[in-house]
Each structure stands twice: as structure tokens, then as C-alpha cells.
């Protein structure tokens, strides 16, 4: 199975797999059962911003999700990613729908990673930024139902021609280039990711959520991972 570290913006509480009984932000380390969660006041039809950061000195992974004009939600978890992830990874966004559904629209996405070694400052820095997404993106690997639309948005899950979200959908977008996330000689390894998103739903209970994830470079969508597994894990263990 893939090695996955993820931040989930989980819109639907699947209490049978350990979710709290409300929409939440969670940090997932190699399992859909989050290590840390915080209640998320999800606002459908409004653009939100998610910011994820990590550095190897504090060994803390933090996510902040906010909507303009309202308070933000923060979740963090202390973890040494050197012990979890391979040295080279890919970073991506995933989303799913299930019985209930929602649009999982990404409007922008940026990422910066830095490795500081004693010898050369920032010798290994990687940065990318999408303010809009082209129709046939050369710099993204689209998996499952993920597509880019004529408005320059990334639709992670299936929408009809009229823009209505479809159920039982799973899609992911990964940056094409592998990222050197850590190395043994690095003094500091850090990364920051930011994406803006829009979730809309005709259902009173939208589902299932969006994630930012880091995985081994040959990662693929596990079969049967739509709905509560958020396109990341083959099972709920």
C-alpha cells in the first residue's frame, strides 16, 4: 500500500471509522483514522483557504482552514516525517463523494519545500504555484475523475455539464515532479502548501471531503476508496 500523510477537510462524519460526529479538519498518518482533529465550520458556496506547514525542527504538522470574514480552524500533530515518508515523494490533492455529494473545486494551489544543509543554503528548494489550471495541464498528474474546466478550475470529483456534483466519485491531482522532502544531512526540512477551494452541494449533508496529501512517487488511487476513504486508503484500518 502507499505511504500517505494527509490533511483532510472532512465534510461528512463517518463515526464508524473514528470520525468525530461533525465536519472536521484532520491529520492522517498512514491511516484514514486521524491522529488529530478539530471541528470545522464548513461553509458551502463560499471560497475557503487551507494552509499546511511543517518543519523538521519543531517536528509539527499544522493546518489552518479559513473563510474570509470568519474565524479559522487549526489542527496540528507532532510527527517526524523522516520516520514516516520516503525521501522522495509526490504531493497532491484528493477528493471524494459517496452516497452524498458535493463539488470539490480547487481554485488555486501553491507549494514550497526547502532542504537546508550545512553546505549550501536552500540547495534543494522546490516551488510551484497555480493561480488557475489549464485545460490539459502538463505539470499535473490527474487521476480518477479529476479534470480541469474552461473556467481555469480543478474539479477533483465528477460534476455534470450543468455543474451539479455526482456521487461515488474519486479524483486526485499530483504535481508532476517528485519532491525531495527530507535527507539525512539536512539541518532543516520544511514545506508550506496553500490551496483555495469551493464546496457546493444540493444535499443537506455534503460529502465527503478534500485532502492535501504526500505519498510515495508511484502512488495511485486505491480501488474502492471513494466516499469515506477520501481517495487515499484501501481500507479503514
UniProtKB/Swiss-Prot annotation:
PTM field: The beta and gamma chains are produced by partial proteolytic processing of the lectin alpha chain by an asparaginyl endopeptidase.
Keyword line: Calcium, Lectin, Manganese, Mannose-binding, Metal-binding
InterPro entries named among the record's database cross-references: ConA-like_dom_sf, Lectin_LegA_CS, Lectin_legB_Mn/Ca_BS, Legume_lectin_dom, Leguminous_Lectin
Domain of life: Eukaryota
GO MF term list: D-mannose binding; metal ion binding
Keyword Cytoplasm: no
Annotated a carbohydrate binding sites: 12, 99-100, 228
Pfam families the UniProt entry points to: Lectin_legB (PF00139)
Binding site for Ca(2+): 10, 12, 14, 19, 208
Record: residues binding Mn(2+): 8, 10, 19, 24, 34
Annotated PANTHER family: CONCANAVALIN A-LIKE LECTIN FAMILY PROTEIN, LEGUME LECTIN DOMAIN-CONTAINING PROTEIN
Record text on subunit structure and interactions: Homotetramer.
Other remarks in the entry: Binds one manganese (or another transition metal) ion and one calcium ion. The metal ions are essential for the saccharide-binding and cell-agglutinating activities.
Its biological purpose: D-mannose/D-glucose-binding lectin. Also binds derivatives of glucose and mannose such as more complex glycans.
Recorded family membership: Belongs to the leguminous lectin family.
Protein name as it appears in the record: Mannose-specific lectin alpha chain
Amino acid at each position: 500500500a502507499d505511504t500517505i500523510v494527509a490533511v483532510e477537510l472532512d465534510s461528512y462524519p463517518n463515526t464508524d471509522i473514528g470520525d468525530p460526529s461533525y465536519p472536521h479538519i484532520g491529520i492522517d498518518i498512514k491511516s484514514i483514522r486521524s491522529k488529530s482533529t478539530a471541528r470545522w465550520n464548513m461553509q458551502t458556496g463560499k471560497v475557503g483557504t487551507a494552509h499546511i506547514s511543517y518543519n523538521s525542527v519543531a517536528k509539527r504538522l499544522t493546518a489552518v482552514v479559513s473563510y474570509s470574514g470568519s474565524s479559522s480552524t487549526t489542527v496540528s500533530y507532532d510527527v517526524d516525517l523522516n520516520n514516516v515518508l520516503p525521501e522522495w515523494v509526490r504531493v497532491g490533492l484528493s477528493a471524494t463523494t459517496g452516497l452524498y455529494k458535493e463539488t470539490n473545486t480547487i481554485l488555486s494551489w501553491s507549494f514550497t519545500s526547502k532542504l537546508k544543509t550545512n553546505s549550501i543554503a536552500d540547495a534543494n528548494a522546490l516551488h510551484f504555484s497555480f493561480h488557475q489550471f489549464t485545460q490539459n495541464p502538463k505539470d499535473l498528474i490527474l487521476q480518477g475523475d479529476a479534470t480541469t474546466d474552461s473556467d481555469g478550475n480543478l474539479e477533483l470529483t465528477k460534476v455534470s455539464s450543468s455543474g451539479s456534483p455526482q456521487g461515488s466519485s474519486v479524483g486526485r491531482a499530483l504535481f508532476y515532479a517528485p519532491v525531495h522532502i527530507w535527507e539525512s544531512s539536512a539541518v532543516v526540512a520544511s514545506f508550506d502548501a496553500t490551496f483555495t477551494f469551493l464546496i457546493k452541494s444540493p444535499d443537506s449533508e455534503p460529502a465527503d471531503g478534500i485532502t492535501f496529501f504526500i505519498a510515495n512517487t508511484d502512488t495511485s488511487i486505491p480501488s474502492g476508496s471513494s466516499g469515506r476513504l477520501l481517495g487515499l486508503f484501501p481500507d479503514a484500518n
